[in-house]
């Protein structure tokens, strides 16, 4: 007999189907171990600042906040006037440097991370050079030199974060300092080590020279000195006049070549920030997409629907126009592609594939990308929808291997900083590898994202920069508050479901297993909004009933009882007391009829029409498919694989769980819609994925029990000449094709007949079955107890780090 979803959620594939699943007192206690008797004081006080937090986040959509870069501002300050080499072009930048030196003599970012001393050294030396060039700030130069001398050892400290190009640029600036006759009393050993390291890197790059090396050298042009071929550098000039959207590189190019477009770009950058510049400009698209990504990953995007829609529309417009801000940056391109495609925009994967081919060929990867970019590209490469996207699929396999290698080597390099950053990054990479986006339920993914969220907002290129759009405590706070609010409602709904089981006497059926918590969990973990209560309970109740009836067909009922049950559903308006063959049939049919009528009444209020007959028809399809399998087993009939799948995708029992819930998620569904081929195709694709996954993992058990199975039938239908391994590979390829087609239909809104919230339910269920089978041997009951606990019973508590950050925000 087929395993319906709720049965799958209970059993290890090797466990016997006839085994009854019961909770011992210990396991029942384990299931609710996370339910705290008293809510923490921090969580209890959260609602008072919920709206304030939401308001602050909303402001991020209207104003991009990006930190000023002292390093880049110093290089812009070195730019001479177009009319006189003896005068600065941007005297206000010089004044900014004079006014923003720190008390210790450095030019560090406020509250900079202690592992950023190399960045501080580089920024401080650049500021000194700018002031010395124009003969101003003698006292500031003196204090800056003193800071460099005291902290020079950090330049070769392997424990410190090394900014991009530091080993080339910093020694070059020391050479410039000597040219300015600056008297730096530096430790000779450290100085010689720096120069030796620079020479080695230059020799290695010359030995392995490639287009990627040329790009890297162009990016760090200010550190190349006389070695730089400026004509080759200008190949990388963008439409806005910049080189790599980087003020320091562009300033160095203007100093060398007097290119007017470079100068125009610098004026634009200063217009944006006043008397200083950022490390990257422009960065608007990436910043806004980071905000959207944070909100979606943490489960709070519903509070910012209008703002997010505006960002998506603008990003799509820029994508279609070929905006360089998207297509010349790997992270931005990958994030834009993933966000747009997942939100139903028609975007080609070609730009992502091209960037992947460029970024990860040769040594360029180590110079211009880090683990965050690799992870972003990996997530984008998962979204293969079309048969002609084989290149993207191949790159996905490469990226997965690369991430696994970096994890195993322990050499994770990040452009992010923060407390326990390595632990957080490793957790994020592990989650991405272990649970592909299609194999994790939405609420489970969001809980994991909240738990491993790194709200440090620092990034590092040649220098560090930060933005609250990249991450902040407000995102984290709002997501925790929202998760716990929903979870409290979910616990009440689970209690209602458990009462329903007792009221309908389903607990009296000795052959049936207790699984209401798991059936409800699959709903709460996929569509969790409070207003979808009726849809969740419909999903869960029908999940309970499908497993009860599956058990009845498999071990609990005689042939006469099974036929009687089907006849009762067909006749519907019958006298239960006289027409039921047995007590068990009476309980099952009574519960089924009462539940279908209840769902029909609720749906009538939303739909404005009676849909009860449709729900009855859905149930009859399932019952007849189960009876057909029973008859096949009785008659020892061996169907073809096509005959089997035509019936088995229905007997997998997802129809009564998913299809009635479509009427309760909000949009109106006309009779034409539910009769449309799209509706039936979505159901078949979803159910086929589930059936094949089940049959692969249940092969050994069902073979031993002499039961029909897609895998065994595939081997039989090929004359026994196909090995089990080859058959499994073929089945997995089939699953992949079906899953991608399902996702394409769910995402392609313009061509769709069904409303998006309805299409998404099919994808949610597909994720449920993929999550269960994502582990080699399936989920054990203990795995599921832990998952149910985290989604329904265990609130997320603010840790000390988050609490401290929030205290500063809300004081």
Swiss-Prot record:
Binding locations of Mg(2+) 2: 550, 554
Reactions it catalyzes: ent-8alpha-hydroxylabd-13-en-15-yl diphosphate = ent-13-epi-manoyl oxide + diphosphate
Cofactor field: Mg(2+)
Annotated Pfam families: Terpene_synth, Terpene_synth_C
Positions of Mg(2+) 1 binding: 550, 554
Single GO MF annotation: magnesium ion binding
EC category: lyase
Pathway involvement of the protein, from the record: Secondary metabolite biosynthesis; terpenoid biosynthesis
EC number, UniProt record: 4.2.3.186
Residues the entry annotates as binding Mg(2+) 3: 694, 702
Keywords: Chloroplast, Lyase, Magnesium, Metal-binding, Plastid, Transit peptide
Positions of short motif DDXXD motif: 550-554
Transit peptide feature range: 1-49
SUPFAM superfamilies found in the cross-reference section: Terpenoid cyclases/Protein prenyltransferases (SSF48239), Terpenoid synthases (SSF48576)
Manner of cofactor binding, per the entry note: Binds 3 Mg(2+) ions per subunit.
Subcellular location: Plastid, Chloroplast
Function according to Swiss-Prot or TrEMBL: Involved in diterpenoid biosynthesis. Catalyzes the conversion of ent-8alpha-hydroxylabd-13-en-15-yl diphosphate to ent-13-epi-manoyl oxide.
The family this protein is said to belong to: Belongs to the terpene synthase family.
Domain notes: The Asp-Asp-Xaa-Xaa-Asp/Glu (DDXXD/E) motif is important for the catalytic activity, presumably through binding to Mg(2+).
UniProt protein name: Ent-13-epi-manoyl oxide synthase KSL2, chloroplastic
Species this chain originates from: Salvia miltiorrhiza
Gene name of the record: KSL2
């Amino acid at each position: 007999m087929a395993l319906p979803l709720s049965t799958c959620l209970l059993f290890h594939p090797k466990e016997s189907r006839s085994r009854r699943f019961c909770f011992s007192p210990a396991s029942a206690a384990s299931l609710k171990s996370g339910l705290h008797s008293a809510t923490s004081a921090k969580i209890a006080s959260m609602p008072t600042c919920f709206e304030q937090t939401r308001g602050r986040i909303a402001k991020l959509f209207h104003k991009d906040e990006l930190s000023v870069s002292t390093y880049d501002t110093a290089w812009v300050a070195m730019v001479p006037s177009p009319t006189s080499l003896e005068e600065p072009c941007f005297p206000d930048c010089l004044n900014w440097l004079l006014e923003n030196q720190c008390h210790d003599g450095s030019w560090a970012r406020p509250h900079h991370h202690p592992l950023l001393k190399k960045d501080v050294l580089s920024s401080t030396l650049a500021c000194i050079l700018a002031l010395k060039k124009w003969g101003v700030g003698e006292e500031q130069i003196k204090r800056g030199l003193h800071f460099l001398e005291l902290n020079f050892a950090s330049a070769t400290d392997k424990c410190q974060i090394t900014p991009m190009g530091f080993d080339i640029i910093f020694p070059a600036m020391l050479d410039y300092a000597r040219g300015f006759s600056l008297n730096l009393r530096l430790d000779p050993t450290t100085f010689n080590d720096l120069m030796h390291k620079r020479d080695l890197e230059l020799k290695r790059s010359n030995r392995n020279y490639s287009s990627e090396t040329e790009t890297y050298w162009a990016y760090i042009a200010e550190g190349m000195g006389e070695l730089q071929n400026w004509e080759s550098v200008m190949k990388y000039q963008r439409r806005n006049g910049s080189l790599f959207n980087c003020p320091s590189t562009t300033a160095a190019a203007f100093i060398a070549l007097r290119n007017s477009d470079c100068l125009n770009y610098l004026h634009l950058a200063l217009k944006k920030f006043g008397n200083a510049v950022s490390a990257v400009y422009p960065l608007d698209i990436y910043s806004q997409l980071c905000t959207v990504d944070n909100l979606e990953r943490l489960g709070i995007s519903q509070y910012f629907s209008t703002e997010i829609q505006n960002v998506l529309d603008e990003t799509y417009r820029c994508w279609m126009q070929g905006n360089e801000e998207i297509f010349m940056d790997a992270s931005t391109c990958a994030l834009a592609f993933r966000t747009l495609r997942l939100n139903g925009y028609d975007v080609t994967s070609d730009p992502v594939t091209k960037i992947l081919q460029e970024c990860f060929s040769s040594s360029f990867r180590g110079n211009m990308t880090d683990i965050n970019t690799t992870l972003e590209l990996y997530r984008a490469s998962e979204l293969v929808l079309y048969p002609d996207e084989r290149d993207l699929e191949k790159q996905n396999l490469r990226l997965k291997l690369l991430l696994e290698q970096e994890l195993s080597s322990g050499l994770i390099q990040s452009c992010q900083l923060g407390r326990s950053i390595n632990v957080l990054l490793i957790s994020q990479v592990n989650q991405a590898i272990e649970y592909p986006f299609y194999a994790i339920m939405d609420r489970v993914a969001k809980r994991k994202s909240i738990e491993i969220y790194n709200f440090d907002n620092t990034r590092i290129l040649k220098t560090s920069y930060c933005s609250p759009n990249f991450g902040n405590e407000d995102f984290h706070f709002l997501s925790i508050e929202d998760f716990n609010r929903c979870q409290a409602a979910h616990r009440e709904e689970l209690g209602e479901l458990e009462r329903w089981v007792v009221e309908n006497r389903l607990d009296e059926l000795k052959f049936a297993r207790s699984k209401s918590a798991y059936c409800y969990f699959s709903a709460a973990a996929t569509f969790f909004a409070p207003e979808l209560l009726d849809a969740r309970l419909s999903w869960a109740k029908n999940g309970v009933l499908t497993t009860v009836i599956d058990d009845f067909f498999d071990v609990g009922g005689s042939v006469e009882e099974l036929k009687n049950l089907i006849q009762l559903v067909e006749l519907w308006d019958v006298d239960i007391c006289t027409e039921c063959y047995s007590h068990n049939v009476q309980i099952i049919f009574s519960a089924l009829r009462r539940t279908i009528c209840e769902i029909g009444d609720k749906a009538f209020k939303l739909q404005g029409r009676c849909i009860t007959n449709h729900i009855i028809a859905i149930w009859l399809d399932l019952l007849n498919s189960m009876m057909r399998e029973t008859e096949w087993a009785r008659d020892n009939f061996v169907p073809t694989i096509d005959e089997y799948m035509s019936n088995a995708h229905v007997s997998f029992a997802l129809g009564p769980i998913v299809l009635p819930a479509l009427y309760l998620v909000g949009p109106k569904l006309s009779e034409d819609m539910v009769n449309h081929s799209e509706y039936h195709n979505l159901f078949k694709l979803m159910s086929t994925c589930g059936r094949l996954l089940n049959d692969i993992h249940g092969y050994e058990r069902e073979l031993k029990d002499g039961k029909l199975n897609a895998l065994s039938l595939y081997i039989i239908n090929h004359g026994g000449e196909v090995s089990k391994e080859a058959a499994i590979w073929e089945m997995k390829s089939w699953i992949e094709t079906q899953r991608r087609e399902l996702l394409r239909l769910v995402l392609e809104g313009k061509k769709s007949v069904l409303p998006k919230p309805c299409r998404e339910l099919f994808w949610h269920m597909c994720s449920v079955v993929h999550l269960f089978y994502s582990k080699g041997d399936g989920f054990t009951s203990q795995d599921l107890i832990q998952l149910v606990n985290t989604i329904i019973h265990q609130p997320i508590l603010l840790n000390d780090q988050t609490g401290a950050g929030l205290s500063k925000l809300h004081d």
